[in-house]
């Protein structure tokens, strides 16, 4: 596969070139999306898809819960990264778009996930961890067990039984907040945000 060449960021989207295509723009935020978009472009090119359609397709591409900006001032990002590779991608994007900025992390995960490396990667530049849990999922690791696991790695945080509680606590700190560790948590968070909008 031809290697994509980064041409810089536009907000949280990335400009890139690949093959015979120049100045393409990803539709999904996050630096690692360049590789995904480049693969899609080359596949479309091989199938004879027009350049105009390729550009429109990239612009229209959306993937909720993947470096999704939920709000600004302070910025809140949801990323469904739930394994080492996903968390590495998240950390890469954070260092690109928010260099040196301190953050709060809201984290939940499934009990069968290996999280030592993920938590260690997230710990750098994190001022506060909020450990929560996914509702109504028998595979979910409890917030208390998650906090205990993190403590064995030298990472301390606040235990929050719901993502709503964690969200409000993190928001009170008025800094970049990242929510990650499980795609299942996205449903709980959007349910909470939708309920608070209607109050």
Where would I find each of the regions flagged by the language model?
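Extended acidic/charged loop-beta regions that coordinate divalent cations
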Residues: 1-23
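Short glycine-/acidic-enriched loop or helix-start segments at secondary-structure transitions
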Residues: 87-88, 115-117, 140-141, 188-191
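A glycine-rich beta-strand to alpha-helix segment
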Residues: 165-194
